[in-house]
UniProtKB/Swiss-Prot annotation:
This is Antibacterial napin. Signal peptide: none annotated. It comes from Brassica rapa subsp. chinensis (Pak-choi). Residues 1-20 are annotated as: Disordered. The keyword Zinc does not apply. Keywords: Antibiotic, Antimicrobial, Disulfide bond, Protein synthesis inhibitor, Seed storage protein, Storage protein. GO terms for molecular function: nutrient reservoir activity. One of its GO terms (biological process) is negative regulation of translation. The lineage of its organism: Eukaryota, Viridiplantae, Streptophyta, Embryophyta, Tracheophyta. The mature protein consists of a small and a large chain linked by disulfide bonds. Belongs to the 2S seed storage albumins family.
Length: 20
């Protein structure tokens, strides 16, 4: 299913915000 814009998942787990 189409999901909202999301940053690529990191190896540690899914992340919904950009790396700071």
């Amino acid at each position: 299913p189409a999901q909202p814009f999301r940053f690529p998942k990191h190896p540690q787990g899914p992340q919904t915000r950009p790396p700071i």
